[in-house]
Amino acid sequence: MPISAQAKSIAIWGAGREGAAALDYVRSHRPETAITVLNDSPLSPSALAALGGARVLIGAEAAQALSAGTFDVVIKSPGVSPYRPEVEKAKRRGVDFTSVTNLWFEENPKAKTIAVTGTKGKTTTSSLIHHMLRKAGLDASLVGNGGVPALTQKTAHEFTVLELSSYQTADLKHAPTIAVITSLYPEHAPWHGGVERYFNDKLRLARLDEKTLLVTNRADPRLCEAFTDRPNTLWYNDRDGFRVADDALFRGAAPFAHPHFPLKGAHNLANLAAALTVVEHLGLDPTACERSLADFAIPPHRLSEFSVDGVLCVDDSISTIPEATLAALKTFAGRPFCLILGGEDRGQSYTELYAYLKERPPRFIALMPANGKRILDELAPLALPFERQLVEDLGQAVDACFRRLEKGDLLLLSPAAPSYGQFVNFEERGRRFEALCRAKGGGGA
């Protein structure tokens, strides 16, 4: 049991998937230990029932107990920032903070691990690696961000692929065997207390131990600056490795055929380049691995396509930054389109996106809260040649777009902003978009 035997009082901060995994873990390993569940907001009756009678502290009461150093150990869920004042106060009182991911590493010190992070591309890249390993006959599991908490993995595997968000790398204490960092753009600044700290928390994955093999992206200037002199590093989008050029994939100077790869866009080819770099390092044949992708299940809400009365609707709800929306637009370049933009305002710059829209204007843009008004105001002096409208919600956005769409057009939900405020997460936003669109045409195809 990695938690100190001297710990008499353990708190679990967060009652979501990772909190539930932590609760099961502590109860099975330390049934005699007092457990308290902390949560920032009130829990529903069903969520309370799932805690099985554990003591629960909510909101200010939880913060007060933390600041007072009431607990010996706190297992923190990823959504809780380690930079919050109550965390700093608790640490000064000797409270030990850990996480489900850290506990898993401590339980599995000899595991072969492939940890994947990046502002964008981590889900697709980790899924590709996992798929290709399994298709090659290797025993591999996939855990982490947005999926199965690592600690719920009860049996050892030959390889464990971990998808890690910046919330999970920020307080990571254990280095993986292989680290993959796909991209680095400004994101999650409020949670991390600034963009530079966000960058450093992401880069931490490869800085814990120089013996970790790093696979990273030569085309990303921030990653180049961070790791140019790092030993034990393999680059993709590099002259000699797997690279993307002119919307095609190459291995060095030679084209690398990828007829079985089901994903569109140069950004997804970059994800494939990262995954192929990893599996080739592990001794697998890249061509055979690419062939195995014929039945790869595309992660949802990432350029997910469906048709409604001759209109191609694309759910790219995962696009929470303008760089991701740019990548989506380039994927469908040349097709008349309407675009749905807007969400939580994190102060991101849309300058490059505006420049692209000037060169390739849409029929119409629907701008959603909360930053839709800011985008509308920023567009006003640019005199761009397309119609735009501020809407109150996604339903109004879809209605406004369908009034202007013609057969053969594209309707793209790629908001360039997080979903919080109107939706629980980007998945809910994507599901709602599809339901609204299908209601326009009797089900789509």
Q: Predicted regions: what is each one?
A:
Residues 30, 172-175, 205-210, 227-229, ...:
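Short, conserved loop/helix-junction motifs that constitute active-site signature segments
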Residues 27, 65-66, 78-218, 222-232, ...:
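Phosphate-binding loop of NTP-binding sites
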Residues 2-29, 33-115, 294, 302, ...:
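Short, basic phosphate-binding NTP loop
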Residues 2-10, 21-25, 258-362:
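Nucleotide phosphate-binding/pyrophosphate-handling subdomain across enzymes
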Residues 26, 74, 97, 116, ...:
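Residue-level signal for inorganic ion chemistry
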